[in-house]
Amino acid sequence: MRLSQYFLPILKENPKEAEIISHCLMLRAGIIRQQTSGIYSWLPLGKKVLDKVCTIIREEQERAGALEISMPTIQSADLWRESGRYDDYGLEMLRIKDRQERDLLYGPTNEEMVTDIFRSYVRSYKDLPLNLYQIQWKFRDEIRPRFGVMRSREFLMKDGYSFDLDYESAKTSYNRMFIAYLRTFSRIGLKVIPMRADTGPIGGELSHEFIILAKTGESAVFCDKRFLEMTAPPVSVDFTDNVVLTDIVKQWTALYATTEEMHNAEEWAQICKSNQLSARGIEVGHIFYFGTKYSEPMGAKVMGRDGKEYPVFMGSYGIGPSRLVAAAIEASHDENGIIWPKPITPFDFGIINTKSDNAKCYGMCETLYQGLVNAGFDPLLDDRNERPGAKFATMDLIGLPTQIIVGPKSAAQDEVEIKDRKTGTKEVLTVEAALNRLSAM
């Protein structure tokens, strides 16, 4: 993509309404635009990042055996009355009526609807286990939306739901998603710590939040420092082997880690002080096991091996892709702008032509650009007729991991400069050597 043909509305000044760095940088870098309180449009640069996050989520869900569906954003209130949550959920749920005066709602979550889908088709234990998920926009009427897309009213959510015959099988499904989430966040470039958490309005017996540590986090968290040394399960993990899954989850839950709501001062005191870490954290995922909380009142039952009917055991699993984008920025930025993790960078490389009217610079930039495109990469070429300082500032702000700088002096020597956005290290290479180096990244 050539920047002269791209829609990238950069803001030079920090927006007054931005309270945290991710909100500020997402507005300044032309990633989002606020339409009204807590509701945002995603602009081209942001949409590319969001799509990459969703692609990784889908790949890991598929690897773990989950099946993607798509449910409507508007739901019937009758389903929520069946589960007993219609009156309990509170003012966060946007209640509406259609022209026939039927009670509807803009879905804040989908336990009831997916349970209705399940009970309409599944009758036998032979069709279990089953895990269905979607990536869909949701709405919760937050009393005080703030921090940009970190706490917005409309947000993108991957919500998944598992159905099993008994507790043992349901726990395996829970473990499967636990591990899939560890892999998902690791691939996105985030270090997460799974923490025991309150089940909240979803309900249930078991719940883990996946937290990244950040100074601007809205949650107080307490964990063992040794979590920071742990690495996510490999791609080779066998999601069909219950013993393997159980062992991995045990490793990741053996150390103390909890949110403020579940914090136990006595257990905390037993941890060596050198391993104690109290910090702020951002929730990027949440998983729940809630047994028959929804299947029982809604009649989601299957015929067991003994010919008797049993309500299915369920779990739900959420990741907020839109929130994840902001969390990635909170975790990786500097005074000049964003530093994207490579897996979710909007463009693979940024090419800066510091002298657009110089024929030599133009030719070398074109060679680099076409060479990278032909090699399967997605580069961004800043070919605008702007001063070099403005081009450097733009490229630093939008955070592409690798910059390729072409100027008259280096071009005269048939050389270009490669700069690592995170470390600031630079390397001077010929165009051919640069293409070889970049293609190997």
Swiss-Prot record:
It is found in: Cytoplasm. The lineage of its organism: Bacteria, Pseudomonadati, Pseudomonadota, Alphaproteobacteria, Hyphomicrobiales. The keyword Transmembrane does not apply. It catalyses: tRNA(Pro) + L-proline + ATP = L-prolyl-tRNA(Pro) + AMP + diphosphate. It comes from Bartonella bacilliformis (strain ATCC 35685 / KC583 / Herrer 020/F12,63). GO terms for cellular component: cytosol. GO terms for molecular function: ATP binding; proline-tRNA ligase activity. It is an enzyme of class 6 (ligase). This is Proline--tRNA ligase. Belongs to the class-II aminoacyl-tRNA synthetase family. ProS type 2 subfamily. The keyword ATP-binding applies. One of its GO terms (biological process) is prolyl-tRNA aminoacylation. Its EC number is 6.1.1.15.
